[in-house]
């Protein structure tokens, strides 16, 4: 995900809850540095390039002096775009993440590093190599280092939508344009923004942790995106998905079109992990991935069905134009059906001997912001998958075709992808 992020797809997948067990063994030390406005820190950092002697970040000195020297002009440039404090803390938060990074090769050679972490790092290194050789993803500085963040998420995103629409509130930033989320390194700051949006603007809000984000390749000169403790212990197939998704953001990224960007990266991760599992993974990893992905697709379909129902409720209807009570009653009915269907889905999983409650928190707090986030990650995936089939599964041709789509305006891009998918995005 630009995430993301999260993101990445973690939001659409409900990944925070299903993978909570991978975080519980790790102490939480809140990082008071705040704010990642979507993919914002990279925009600030790229505006002023650091000299080679500070490229590792960890050994540069005096640290405070060079940070101020580099970031002061950046903040001046950004002041006209929004809160200087927000951007300052965005840059500080990302620098803290970069300072914590150590080369993977160094960690693998360090006898003090735990064997289980070494195994995950070695696996991730192989996945990155596979992404380059088999998926035509970029071979650059990203994922050659590892950062132990000592917290459960890389950033916390805030999304918001009106009570009668799935259209996400958008925040606009330099270089990346406008996105449907605003991110923070400190969860308390994210919750505070969400509370203000709900109180002052009457919006429905969602705060969610993101395990990874992409700097879109702009910071390869400074070491690229590191592997993070927030996702390194994911099951094999999920770890591969994360790496493939974030690298895809470095191939194609279109300003002001979150749905296009995230759907493309989601298609890359899905298609890529299928190939990785078929050629690189063992039977156990394939079984585990099939089980989890089956649940994920069932939950996505359930969410997609409810989105369609809510879109019909919110569509302009003269009879409801002045009857908010009727509109909200229909909305409540759609939400109730969503929760009833989810309860049945859980019962089916339990009956099949694979009980799972990883989506419970998402369902309990489901609102317009939740469904708006979901749409960003999967709405156009079928079109991208159809495009991949159209080019014969040739990865370089696929990426080139996506670059051509990126040259079109938003409406044309979406129309082409929906046509490729057969007229509507109903399956991923």
Ranges and model annotations:
Residues 7, 14-20, 29-30, 43-44, ...:
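Short hydrophobic alpha-helical segments enriched in small aliphatic residues
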Residues 47-70:
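Bacterial N-terminal signal peptides that target proteins for export
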Residues 77-80:
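C-terminal motif of bacterial Sec signal peptides marking the signal peptidase cleavage site
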Residues 82-85:
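Bacterial signal peptide processing site
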Residues 87-115:
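Post-signal peptide N-terminal segment of mature Sec-exported envelope proteins
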Residues 97, 110, 117-124, 183-187, ...:
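Solvent-exposed, acidic/flexible segments
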Residues 126-296, 311:
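Acidic/His-rich structured neighborhood in mature extracellular/periplasmic domains
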Residues 301-428:
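Pan-zinc metallopeptidase signature
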């Amino acid at each position: 995900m630009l995430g993301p992020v999260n993101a990445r797809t973690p939001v659409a997948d409900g990944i925070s809850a299903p993978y909570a067990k991978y975080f519980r063994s790790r102490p939480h030390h809140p990082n008071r540095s705040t704010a990642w406005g979507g993919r914002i820190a990279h925009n600030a950092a790229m505006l002023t390039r650091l000299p080679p002697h500070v490229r590792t970040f960890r050994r540069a000195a005096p640290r405070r002096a060079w940070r101020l020297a580099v970031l002061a002009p950046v903040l001046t440039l950004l002041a006209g775009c929004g809160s200087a404090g927000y951007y300052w803390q965005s840059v500080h938060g990302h620098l803290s993440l970069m300072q914590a990074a150590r080369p993977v090769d160094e960690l693998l050679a360090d006898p003090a590093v735990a064997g289980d972490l070494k195994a995950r790092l070695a696996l991730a290194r192989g996945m990155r190599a596979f992404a380059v050789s088999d998926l035509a993803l970029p071979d650059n500085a990203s994922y050659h280092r590892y950062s132990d963040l000592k917290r459960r998420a890389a950033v916390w995103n805030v999304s918001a939508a009106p009570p009668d629409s799935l259209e996400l509130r958008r925040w606009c930033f330099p270089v990346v344009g406008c996105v449907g989320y605003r991110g923070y390194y400190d969860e308390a700051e994210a919750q505070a923004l969400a509370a203000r949006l709900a109180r002052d603007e009457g919006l429905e809000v969602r705060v969610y942790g993101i395990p990874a984000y992409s700097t879109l390749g702009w910071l390869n000169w400074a070491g690229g995106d590191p592997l993070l403790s927030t996702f390194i212990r994911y099951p094999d197939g999920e770890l591969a998905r994360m790496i493939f998704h974030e690298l895809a953001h470095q191939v194609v990224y279109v300003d002001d079109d979150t749905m296009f960007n995230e759907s493309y990266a989601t298609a890359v991760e899905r298609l890529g992990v299928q190939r990785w599992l078929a050629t690189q993974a063992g039977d156990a990893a394939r079984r585990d991935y099939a089980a989890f992905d089956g649940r994920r697709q069932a939950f996505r379909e359930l969410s997609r069905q409810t989105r369609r129902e809510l879109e019909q409720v919110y569509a302009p209807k003269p009879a409801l134009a002045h009857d908010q009570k009727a509109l909200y009653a229909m909305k409540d009915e759609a939400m109730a059906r969503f929760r009833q269907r989810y309860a049945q889905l859980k019962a089916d999983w339990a009956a099949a001997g694979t009980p799972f409650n990883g989506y419970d928190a998402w369902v309990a707090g489901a609102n317009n912001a939740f469904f708006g986030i979901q749409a960003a990650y999967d709405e156009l995936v079928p079109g991208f998958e159809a495009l991949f089939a159209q080019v014969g599964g040739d990865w370089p041709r696929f990426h080139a075709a996506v670059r051509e789509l990126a040259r079109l305006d938003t409406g044309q891009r979406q129309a082409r992808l929906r046509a490729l998918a057969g007229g509507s995005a109903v399956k991923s």
